Every structure is written in structure tokens, then in C-alpha cells.
Amino acid sequence: MADDEAQLAAFAEQLIEQVDTSIGGWVTRSVFVAAGAGGVAVVEDDLDAVIEKTRVAAMPEIRRVLRADVDTPAGSPLAALRNAVGPMTALLDRWGAARPPRDEFLERQFPGDPYQLGPAAFSDVDEDLHEPGLVWGAARAHVHLRRRRESDHG
């Protein structure tokens, strides 16, 4: 394994660990904001189960995406998090939270996220994920470009 690929793997493992650690705070903040906007009170006893369900929904895909070879179309770690909002959505629906209005773009692009809980950036999950997310993305791009150069000149 080339040095840059080993470094990419290390960055991926660091990001996996940090995302896993950040899920609880992200779920809690997201549920509190959506519940408040939706006119319902948070039942804190329900949060632990939803945090764990969200973790179970997100982390296998996060691991797969971040560990994937750069030449394999693997998707996005943020898409994996956006696709894991189901437990939060179900909880907010059960509580009777009003869903915010959404335009056609949001309806079409994120049909499973009626409360707009999914992150657009790593910093939407946790500010501490911003830099590791950028570093991982840059390292992935570097490895991809190096391989392209080598195959073009090899």
C-alpha cells in the first residue's frame, strides 16, 4: 500500500470514530430543534433508543463508504447520515410534530427527510467533524489523482 493510501485509511478510521461519537449529540440537537419548531415537547426518555437506532442505521454505511477504494463508486458519508434520519422522523411523527413546509426540490431530493434533519456538511453533525471531513476528502482526491497520473504515464 502506498504511503498516501495508508494515510487515507488512517484519516478514514479517525473520521469513522468521530462520526460515531458525534451521532448522539447530532440526534439530540436535531430532535430538540424539530420538536420545538413542530410545536411539541421532547420526551427525553425516547432519545436514547432513537440515538442507537440512528447509529445502527448510519454506521455500517459510513464504514463502507469511508473504507472503500477510491476507484470504487461508494457514495458519500453525508448521504449515509442523511439516509439515517428515519428513526428521528418516526419519533417526531409519533409525538405529532408539525412538518415544516418544503419546496419541490427538497421533496424530490430528500423524500425521506420531511423534518429536514439530514446534514448538508459534516459541521451540521458536529463542528469538530469539519476539519477531519475535509482532510479525508482531500486525501481521497489526492490518491485518486495520483492513480490517474500513474495510469496515464504507466
Spans of model-derived segments:
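Extended, amphipathic alpha-helical stalk segments that mediate dimerization
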Residues: 1-75, 83-154
